[in-house]
Structure formats: C-alpha cells, structure tokens
Amino acid sequence: MTRVGQRDSPAKEEAPPATKKRFLTPGRFVTILCIINLINYVDRGVIASNGVNGSSKVCDAKGVCSAGTGIQGEFNLTNFEDGLLSSAFMVGLLVASPIFAGLSKRFNPFKLIGVGLTVWTIAVIGCGFSYNFWMIAVFRMFVGVGEASFISLAAPYIDDSAPVARKNFWLGLFYMCIPAGVALGYVFGGYIGNHLGWRWAFYIEAIAMAVFVILSFCIKPPQQLKGFADKDSKKPSTSIETVAPTDAEASQIKTKTPKSKNLVVLFGKDLKALFSEKVFIVNVLGYITYNFVIGAYSYWGPKAGFGIYKMKNADMIFGGLTIICGIIGTLGGSYVLDRINATLSNTFKLLAASTLLGAAFCFTAFLMKNMYAFIALFAVGEILIFAPQAPVNFVCLHCVRPNLRPLSMASSTVLIHILGDVPSSPLYGKMQDHLKNWRKSTLIITSILFLAAIIWGIGIFMNSVDRSNEVSEDDEVEEDKLESKTENSTLA
C-alpha cells in the first residue's frame, strides 16, 4: 500500500496566531435566528388576519348579499376550505423536515437553512400572485418547505451557543417569536389588507425575508453544531494516516452500496433510535394535544372574538393581547425553568402545571358574557399557556444524543402539526359550520388542553436522563464508514 497525506511533525512548536474578535458573536447569531423565526410566524398571522383572510359573502333573509373581502371573499371559500388553506403549508413541512434533518449530517446545516429560506421567499411571492384557491394552496405548501429547513436546525444552534445557565432563556427568546410573530401578523395583515390589499402583505414579507436569505449564504455560525463535523473544512492529515486503496480494495469499493442508499440506512437507524426514547414519545404526545388547541386559537381566535363579543378591530385586540401575553409567558416559562434547575423531570412539572392552570383560565374566560371580563381572564390564561413554548423544546433537545437533535426537532415539528394544528383548524371550522355557535365551539376546543396537562404529568414520573452531552462511538463509527464509502466510491 502507498501511504499518502503523511507529514512530519514540526521541530519547533509555533506560537498560535492571535485570534481576532469575531463580529458574529453567539448573541448576534441568535438574534438573526430570532428575526427569521419572527418573520416566519408573521406569515402565519397574516394568513389568518381578517384584513388578509377576510370574510365570505353574506346574504340576509331578503336575499340581499354583501360582498366578501380578502382571500375568502375573492375566492369564495367555505370555512372548511379556509381552514384547509391555513394548513396547506404542512404538506411541504411534512415532506421536507426529515429530509433536511438527514441532509444536515452530510451538508452545512446553515447553508441548508439558506436553501429553505429561498424556497420560502419565492413561495410567499407566489401567494401574492395567486388567482384561485388551488394556486394559493400550492404556494402555501412550498412555504412549509422553507420552514422545514429552519425549524429543525435553529434550535440545536441556539442550544449550543447559549450559556449553560441561560439555555432556556435563550430558547425562550427564540420561541417568544412564535406568539409575537403571529400577533404581529394579525396587526400587520389587518392594516396592510385594509389599506393596500391582501396581496401586498405577502410581497412585503418576502422583501423582509430576502435580507436573511442573503445572510444565510454569506455568514458562518460562531459555533459548530455539537455532534456534527464541520462540513466546510477539510479533515486534518497530521494525526491520521490516509491509505490509498489497493486494486483488490478498489474492486470491493465498487460493490459498496450507493451514497443515497447509505444515507437512507443511516436515517432509518436514527429514526429507530429516536422513537425508542420513551421520554421523547410522552413529550411529543403532550405537545400534539397542546398544539391542537393552539392551532385553532391562532387561526380562528379573531373571528371567534368577533362572533362572541362583537369586538371591533378583533385583529388588533387579539394581536395586541397575544403579543404581550406571548412574550411574558414564553420568557417567564423559560426563566422559571432556568431558576428551578432544568432537569427533564422539573421541565415536565412546569409543562403540566402551566397548561392545567392556563386551560382553567381560558375555559372560564369563554364562559363570561362581559367582554372585559373575558379579556382579563383570557390574558392570564394565555400567559400560562405560552409558558411551555421553550421547555417543551428543551425536552426534545435534551432527551436524545446531540447528533439526533435535528431529527428530534424535525419529527416533533411534523407530528405536532400533522396530528395537531393541521386537523384542528378545518375541524374547528367544520364544527362551527354545524353548531353555528362560536362560544360552544371554542369551549369544546379549549377543554382539550386539560388532556395535554395530564399527558405531560406522566412525564414527571418517568426515569428521564439528560442525554445532550452523550457521545456515541458507535454513531461516529457508522458515520465514518458512510463517509468512507461515499468518498472511496469516487476513486473506484
């Protein structure tokens, strides 16, 4: 065999070069991720706002009809079709999330985020140019592809970049952008829809995201993801001897399985390992139930508020309420978890308690006849309901080994949507079409939060271990074998 890539060790050890202070500090990097997340969820609020979503044509007993407004009015959608439109992004998210999670082991994760955000931007522009239900529904599906690249990879970056004592608070800042973004979307969509037309809300979103598309291809994260090799750097040859294959070895390489098949096999092993984690299963089951209600609230909240209490400017009221309560609740929940020692058992205690109390306040709020009593009780309920936003994702990140975190986040995202807010929006619409009573429909959907609290309560009594610092030699060997196969196949 011919040995290549060997270098003699230097006779004299050179002094390390002076390190320059990087402009992109962990704090600035996390700020960029938070803004991207905010814009993403502004889009969720925009599509649900009365100014953009609008209302269908209404006819009175005399047959006199008033013209519809927004998307629903222009495309003449039923409540069920309208609910489907809110969930269409999930098709892209479902397909693309596991793909991006798998590709993160072979390609630079942050560049993958850039690819996804490019798709997101183009799809949002397409929403503005749509002229019927099916066209805008297809573009909403591609919006989900863009979100898939970001949602499964951003949280592990934050988990690695944050100081140990403030991990949950930094995650809280990131997940605070969910309620804040949706709420800003209500306000932004209502204002732009009423003044410039619903299509312009999408165009402005795309312009805002385009800046971060460019950044994602130009900047390098301040820290490499734990459990992953640096895909942009070449492997050092100082400590490892590289051996050129003999003719016999080369002939064996030709019979190796192709790169794509190796990736599929490795992905299958990762998926099996993930779903063998009982803590992950219980956490996600509670998250699915929780998100079923949150999805219905986020899409139908302004319309329910108008239908029950005849609120003027329901978009503004729900938007403002959700911004304030979402920020307080999300940051409050993450701060409390950091203070009480963020073990997995303590996290489940916080999840169960805050959801149970939040459900009680929200249920009582919708029983109130007085609008101001409703707002006061619902505000307290929202603060408590938003408290789990960071802790539930902390469990997803810390109940698995580091190299499984993107897949854990991707799988969690897929499941909470496909079994949570995706069916809840159209089912709520179908229930309202049948009951024709906004109060009853909302009370029924709110009661499901009690089930989420019970499921998370089970997690308190499980034998849970924080695995975020585990390094599996078996995994490293498997990935080295995979890389060796794919690299050597080019030599054969």
Swiss-Prot record:
Single biological process term from Gene Ontology: lipid transport
UniProt keyword annotations, A-Z: Endosome, Glycoprotein, Lipid transport, Lysosome, Membrane, Phosphoprotein, Transmembrane, Transmembrane helix, Transport
The membrane topology noted for this protein in its Swiss-Prot or TrEMBL record is: Multi-pass membrane protein
Q: Which residues are glycosylated?
A: 53, 76, 341, 488
Chain positions covered by the region annotation Disordered:
472-492
A GO cellular component annotation in the UniProt record: lysosomal membrane
- Which cell locations does it reside in? Late endosome membrane; Lysosome membrane
TM spans, by residue? 29-49, 83-103, 119-139, 141-161, 169-189, 200-220, 279-299, 317-337, 348-368, 372-392, 407-427, 442-462
The organism's superkingdom is given as Eukaryota
Residue ranges under compositional bias (Acidic residues)? Answer: 472-481
Pfam families according to UniProt: MFS_1
Which residues are connected by disulfide bridges in this protein?
A: none
Q: Does the keyword Membrane apply?
A: yes
Chain positions found as Phosphoserine: 472
Give the Gene Ontology MF terms in alphabetical order: transmembrane transporter activity
The function of this protein is:
Probable sphingolipid transporter that plays a central role in endosomes and/or lysosomes storage.
Which family does this protein fall into? Belongs to the major facilitator superfamily. Spinster (TC 2.A.1.49) family.
Q: Which PANTHER family match?
A: SPHINGOLIPID TRANSPORTER SPINSTER HOMOLOG 1-RELATED, SPINSTER
- The name under which this protein is listed is Probable sphingolipid transporter spinster homolog 1
